[in-house]
Amino acid sequence: MRTCYTGQVCRDHLGQTVTLYGWVNRRRDHGGVIFIDLRDRTGLAQIVFDPDNAEAFGTAERLRNEFCISITGLVRLRPEGTANAELASGEVEVLCQQVEILNASVTPPFQLDDDNLSETTRLTHRVLDLRRPQMQHNLMLRYRVSIEVRKYLDQLGFIDIETPMLTKSTPEGARDYLVPSRVNAGYFFALPQSPQLFKQMLMVSGFDRYYQITKCFRDEDLRADRQPEFTQIDCETSFLNEVEIREIFEGMIRHVFKVVQDVDLPTPFPIMSWTEAMQRYGSDKPDLRVNLEFTDMTDVMRDVDFKVFASAATTAGSRVVALRVQGGGEMSRSEIDAYTQFVGIYGAKGLAYIKVNDVAKGREGLQSPIVKNLHDAALAELVKRTGAQNGDIIFFGADRAKVVNDAIGALRVKIGHSEFGKKAGLFSGGWKPLWVVDFPMFEYDEEENRYTAAHHPFTSPKDGHEDFLESDPGKAVAKAYDMVLNGWEIGGGSVRIHREEVQSKVFRALKIDAEEAREKFGFLLDALQYGAPPHGGIAFGLDRIITMMAGAESIRDVIAFPKTQRAQCLLTGAPSEVDEKQLRELHIRLRNVEVK
């Protein structure tokens, strides 16, 4: 029976006989003495095989990388000068008395310490990839975070309740993953995009504090921070307002960071309205580590001769912003061209700029092809508003507000994170949390000529905004809030609608008529009529949180068996074809299938 894990062997075990299990990480033959590094999920221990123990030594000669073995031996100090300070077990070694090969291994397709493996190779051989210390660290970190979340919520009276994985498809949100019903021919379940409706009905049922750590599913195009199946810390409460809800879950995140990583997050988290975030940063999830902000110049540029600025400044739904970069006047033409190409990804047609050489000289101290098209009053106001100093550069965005926000917002982050930005003090590092509140309830879809829910259609309007649901939905502000950390949205929630008549108004604003609302959400509308309490909640993306805490490059590095950006599992070959018999049982016939 194992006495301890390999990474736990230390001076405390000196003179003791231990039994260890694990995998051969490396084998070395030094002058007749064989050494192996034995590895398990806790770390390494050095095992010594002396030729005086002929049986154990003979077995050791057959060992190769990734053999699974057990050893029993005596813990002793390593010889003087051979200690390894990088290992927890680095002061000691185990003199093997007995060794058993539990299972041999074929030659692995790669060395576990190879840092240049392609992601395809790693995901295809995920079983071996997960043996790598960094991956084991990531999954242990994930486990520890989950444990601390549960401890925190349990202490506050939250109840872990499971909700269905097979549920009803609804028209709002991302594409559903559909599951055909064999018993009910022609009908389909959907895998849940979130437990949203079930947790609201749990509130109606009287379970006033609910949570679960659960899988959710969305059939959408993947990005670096997205997976078709992802894990959510899902929470809901009754009888609390949005401020009280934020306090509870801010406390949860602070607790997790302190206990797991010994990081003290600020108290309290700053709060910013959605409108302010978009005005200052062009993003509803601003990275506050970057010390750069927009300066709105729309009102100043209405009468300038530069048509790009004047047109944007006088067109509804457009804006002109300036981004002052301290010390950026030293940027080369090639660097500016690279940034111009970068903002083009976000729809910007160009990137105007002005270099500030000498503020005291006014127009003559400013360097740019566009200076001649801006009158003196506009230039003076630009310098005043931005606080520009000698040696700065000012970039501009002038277009539809969405293009400006996306392009210059991304430029802000790119410059801040660049080598230049860090040297110039434009990036402060650390952890910068933020609550973004007061989101619009609706976004207008030009193609469909209707409003869509900015979060989801069950979010409550702010007090005094209920009348806008019928008169002017675009003005309605929601009791919604997102928790943002270092430019990532790690959690989002809202106070929910708990009155049936208000929910029906929201459906009408979304052009969901009474018949469709009854068909899709009748169970919710009915539940709200039985004394539904005021309630609200939040959901956190566990995968995102772990990615940040681990400093991982991809969300796939913190999930045991992730999908690729084509939503495939390279380990198992999923998704895969199924045989005709299975399809017939499900009453499904395939047609016009394009093989990719």
Curated annotation (Swiss-Prot):
SUPFAM superfamilies noted in UniProt: Class II aaRS and biotin synthetases, GAD domain-like, Nucleic acid-binding proteins
GO molecular function, one term: nucleic acid binding
Entry GO terms, CC: cytoplasm
Reported function: Aspartyl-tRNA synthetase with relaxed tRNA specificity since it is able to aspartylate not only its cognate tRNA(Asp) but also tRNA(Asn). Reaction proceeds in two steps: L-aspartate is first activated by ATP to form Asp-AMP and then transferred to the acceptor end of tRNA(Asp/Asn).
Binding residues for L-aspartate: E172, R218, H455, R496
Entry binding sites for ATP: R218, D219, E220, Q227, E489, G541, L542, D543, R544
Gene designation per UniProt: aspS
Keywords, ordered alphabetically: Aminoacyl-tRNA synthetase, ATP-binding, Cytoplasm, Ligase, Nucleotide-binding, Protein biosynthesis
Lineage: Bacteria, Pseudomonadati, Pseudomonadota, Betaproteobacteria, Burkholderiales
InterPro entries: Aa-tRNA-synt_II (IPR004364), aa-tRNA-synth_II (IPR006195), aa-tRNA-synth_II/BPL/LPL (IPR045864), Asp-tRNA-ligase_1 (IPR004524), Asp-tRNA-ligase_1_N (IPR047089), Asp/Asn-tRNA-synth_IIb (IPR002312), AspRS_core (IPR047090), GAD-like_sf (IPR004115)
E.C. code: 6.1.1.23
One protein family per Pfam: tRNA-synt_2
Reaction(s) catalysed by this chain's protein: tRNA(Asx) + L-aspartate + ATP = L-aspartyl-tRNA(Asx) + AMP + diphosphate
Protein name: Aspartate--tRNA(Asp/Asn) ligase
Region listing for Aspartate, in residue ranges: 196-199
Assembly behavior: Homodimer.
Family the entry assigns: Belongs to the class-II aminoacyl-tRNA synthetase family. Type 1 subfamily.
Domain of life: Bacteria
Keyword Nucleotide-binding: yes
Marked site positions, Important for tRNA non-discrimination: H30, G81
UniProt GO BP: aspartyl-tRNA aminoacylation
Enzyme class: ligase
Cellular localisation: Cytoplasm
